[in-house]
Amino acid sequence: MLKKEIKHTRIVKKEFNRDTVDYYDDIYSSQGLKKYYMVKNILEDFTSKVGQHIQILDLEQFGKALFIDNELQVAEKDEHLYSSTFVNSGLKLNPEKNNSAIIGGGDGGVARECINQGFNYIDWYELDPQVVDVCEKHLSKVGQKATKKNSIKCVWGDAFESIKKVEDNKYDKIFVDLNDDQYCIDLAAKNIKSLKRILKPNGTITAQVGSQDKKPKQVEKWLNLFKKSFGNSSLDRIYIPSFDCSWNFASSLNK
């Protein structure tokens, strides 16, 4: 139900009921609590060709926001906190930024940040072009038409299949902006050798790994994966108001 449809002064949509934790442990609400977003309008609501439920909601507190499969991905009001911390986490370990690979990140925020940081060439591997299209339409402040920039090359489809064709030691930076559930941890673990192969010596890999406050075991798994594969790992965090928690980014240097 939308706020504008009733006389009551406040109404909420996108109820995340986490009382049954076993079934809803992939959504970031504290155990036993309900999380609400005030919705002014629903701008998009459809299932993409690759099977993702995509929604663009205009939130009262956070502006236009992307939801995929009923989970908030990005809100225009505080997206810059996420993307800037993400990219700077890798740059802290090594400032080299000739080229980068982005795995996922369909909203375009990480791509925009790489452009703003002065990367010369960016290969953006994204599964679902409809996510990119709908974000360019409604969340233009986030991506800032990144796909139209000369420094960006978009590669559509399964990223891990695509990188099999990439030459060794290509990228200074790899940013893994996938979902933060167990499936994506397993997917990254399965393909970590391929990611390491295309990363330059002394290049850095950074992944968004979720919230250490909400899912400490999940973050630990990411850190262990990076440490096992690269011999080192570091962790950065930033509070994201629309997520209602701190968010973490794990990085490793390819020594």
Question: Model-found features: residue ranges?
Answer:
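Short, isolated positions in well-ordered beta-strands
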Residues: I54, Q73-V74
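C-terminal lobe and adjacent flexible extensions of AdoMet/dcAdoMet transferase-like proteins
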Residues: L253-K255
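Conserved S-adenosyl-L-methionine
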Residues: F230-P241
